[in-house]
Amino acid sequence: MEIKQINSTIKSRAAVAFAPNQPLQIVEIDVEMPRKGEVLIRNTHTGVCHTDAFTLSGSDPEGVFPVVLGHEGAGVVVAVGEGVLSVKPGDHVIPLYTAECGECEFCRSGKTNLCVSVRDTQGKGLMPDCTTRFSYQGQPIYHYMGCSTFSEYSVVAEVSLAKINPEANHEQVCLLGCGVTTGIGAVHNTAKVQEGDSVAVFGLGAIGLAVVQGARQAKAGRIIAIDTNPAKFELAKQFGATDCLNPNDYDKPIKDVLLDINKWGIDHTFECIGNVNVMRQALESAHRGWGQSIIIGVAGAGQEISTRPFQLVTGRVWKGSAFGGVKGRSELPQMVEDSMKGDIQLEPFVTHTMPLDKINEAFELMHEGKSIRTVIHY
């Protein structure tokens, strides 16, 4: 749909979270036109991610309601605000929950992808000018992670958009907006896995499976996939896992099982769940002297991690990774190209597709462990 004459607001179908722990409601909201430095996009597809469910549960310390969730999408630019030069109407884009302005201290450092240009307001569910572009029956609706892909139309900061190849399949590349990029990037950018290294992946959701795929790309020697749901093992092996372990099959902690495989531990471990107890096991199963454990999963508000200091004194390293260390505007377009060439597999992640009206079913499938990613289409 093209908007030939831009009015001050347009109508948009959206799945709105009016309160925590309640089903999303499909309603027609008002979306204002983009202001300076902003872009109006029409989302064509969006994945449903565990992070959306985490916020909906009420456990997210930055969760605000009512809100349009969704942060793993792909769409087309409809209109641009004053000063926007990097995209134009008709361009195909992926919204970014991790912006890249290129000008803040973090971007200029070259050491991180954690741009802070819009971070403060984004964490409050607002646009950079501290207002919202969404409303319903005259009441403001908050944005989410700077993306809000559960609305057909959304307004996003220019610095939070990656321009991509218009030939890309949106049903698949939308997953590069979060889960797949997070997992693959953590392997290459955060852990820097080398050929022949051993890898253990705790949790085989989309992110964990993406870690497995990234480890295979890095030519890791042994890739151990760990999950309590053995139904995920077939796909893990398809992505490159050499071993699949179910902790419920053992009468001892999975950490000890891994130390039986190698008494000194695993070169790189990845926690992809958000469970602080698993985070400890992942660290303590890392190789003595040089092993590193990468925390990707997001734990609930107020939860803390712990271990004996001796685990770190003896050479293990604990690291965190956000969006796989990937710089969205400058690096994500190449990942889209890689997926189009088959170097990144995306299709196997999409286990279900459905229209927006059925989005609550997508959350049910996720909670029941019956899906890897459900993609919503508009």
From Swiss-Prot:
Q: What's an example GO cellular component term for this entry?
A: cytosol
Enumerate the UniProt keywords alphabetically: Cytoplasm, Metal-binding, NAD, Oxidoreductase, Zinc
> Which annotated residues bind Zn(2+) 1?
49, 71, 178
Q: Name one GO molecular function term.
A: S-(hydroxymethyl)glutathione dehydrogenase [NAD(P)+] activity
InterPro entries xref list: ADH-like_C (IPR013149), ADH-like_N (IPR013154), ADH_3 (IPR014183), ADH_Zn_CS (IPR002328), GroES-like_sf (IPR011032), NAD(P)-bd_dom_sf (IPR036291), PKS_ER (IPR020843)
Cofactor entry: Zn(2+)
Instruction: Provide the cofactor note recorded for this chain's UniProt entry.
Output: Binds 2 Zn(2+) ions per subunit.
Which reaction is the catalytic activity of this chain? S-(hydroxymethyl)glutathione + NADP(+) = S-formylglutathione + NADPH + H(+); S-(hydroxymethyl)glutathione + NAD(+) = S-formylglutathione + NADH + H(+); a primary alcohol + NAD(+) = an aldehyde + NADH + H(+); a secondary alcohol + NAD(+) = a ketone + NADH + H(+)
What is the enzyme's main class?
oxidoreductase
What's an example Gene Ontology biological process for this entry?
Answer: formaldehyde catabolic process
Pfam families per the UniProt record, alphabetical: ADH_N, ADH_zinc_N
- Subcellular location(s) per record: Cytoplasm
Report the EC number(s), separated by commas if there are several. Answer: 1.1.1.284, 1.1.1.1, 1.1.1.-
Q: Does the keyword NAD apply?
A: yes
Family annotation (CDD domains):
alcohol_DH_class_III (cd08300)
Record: residues binding Zn(2+) 2: 101, 104, 107, 115
Quaternary structure annotation from Swiss-Prot or TrEMBL: Homodimer.
Family, per entry: Belongs to the zinc-containing alcohol dehydrogenase family. Class-III subfamily.
Role of this protein: Has high formaldehyde dehydrogenase activity in the presence of glutathione and catalyzes the oxidation of normal alcohols in a reaction that is not GSH-dependent. In addition, hemithiolacetals other than those formed from GSH, including omega-thiol fatty acids, also are substrates. Also acts as a S-nitroso-glutathione reductase by catalyzing the NADH-dependent reduction of S-nitrosoglutathione.
Q: What is this protein called?
A: S-(hydroxymethyl)glutathione dehydrogenase
Gene designation per UniProt:
frmA
